[in-house]
Amino acid sequence: MLRTSRRRRIAATALAVGSIAVLAGCGTSGGSSTPTEAVDELGDYEGEVSIIAWAGYVEDGSNDPDYDWVSGFEEKTGCQVTSKTFNTSDEAVTLMKTGDYDVVSASGDASLRLIAAGDVQPVNVDLIPSYEGVYDFLKDQPWNTVDGEHYGVPHGYGANLLLYNTEVVTPAPTSWDVVFDKAGDYSGKITAYDNPIYIADAAVYLMTHQPDLGIENPYALDETQFQAAVDLLKEQRQHVGEYWSDYLKEIQAFETGDSVAGTTWQVIQNVLAGEGATTDVVLPDEGATGWSDTWMISSTTEHPNCSYAWLDWIASPEVNGVATSYFGEAPSSDAACDYREDCEAYHAGDADYASQIWYWTTPIAECLDGRTDVECMDYSAWTEAWSEIKG
């Protein structure tokens, strides 16, 4: 039985990617044995599979006996699961380079690095029955498909929303201006996500409020566009009471009143609402950044059959419904909503809602919006600028 309450142990989807130099500077970790094409058929299960994932993605009942989707997989396949959690995409990329793990749950900021370095292999989605039911708007996306080649199976997705104190921030906001141009109204009580990727949030805002900048993609910023986003965040800094990456700290800040407006995840609002806090969330008119995670298979795995079995299992309706509910995000299919009670809160399957989300993507010098007459600022520049923004 699923429950709508959210425990404070639900994992934060922290994002802290490193320099994009890894894309150009690293070869494959598997040498000549690295698969360049997806497999055509599967064989017998190997009896084990090693998985690295965000906390809350591979639950065996040890954290909460009501949430266990590992035991059923082991019983069905005979593949014994060992798992390790990571806290950042940087950590995930580093761990996959060791070749010690078979499967990884990768956010969009990590997936392309893994693909470019040859650390993950193409996936034959025809061998994964559950893939057929996955929402179309999660398939064939830049973070999971390259040159028509699939590299994994979508898991869950969500938007970075605007959280606000309903008693303090009135009328109810519909724009990100409450944390940018109007941040002075709540100076010292604005909160922002503590990561260089937050520069994209400023870029999303500027797409609407400074259209002359010509920003078409918040992860594809030339020097002028990038500087405008950085300047906006430097102006915001004087009004920020706390930069957060630990979701528990944001919950506490809104409970105590230390924060009254800022970026958040739906799961944080769920926890606050469950505890009676006077808060609400909105996806502002300008749109928002967000995430879409992908299950991927190591290019050097010695357990491809168990790995494929996991990708099919975790995308199956009941398991995906339970797993994404536990974590606090929308599932990957309509069928998964039959096994959870809160799909409406997460706008699951709402393509129009999803179209307002700019999913996390690693910025690179080759502009992701297709421009070839300029060079865009890569993630190393974003990282350097973030240090300057915070001071």
PLM ranges: what are they?
Residues E132-G133, V230-Q236, E275-M296:
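Periplasmic-binding protein-like
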Residues C26-T36:
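Bacterial lipoprotein signal-peptidase II cleavage site
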Residues Y359-G391:
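Conserved C-terminal helix/tail region of periplasmic/extracytoplasmic solute-binding proteins
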Residues T289, S298-A365:
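Mature extracytoplasmic/periplasmic domains
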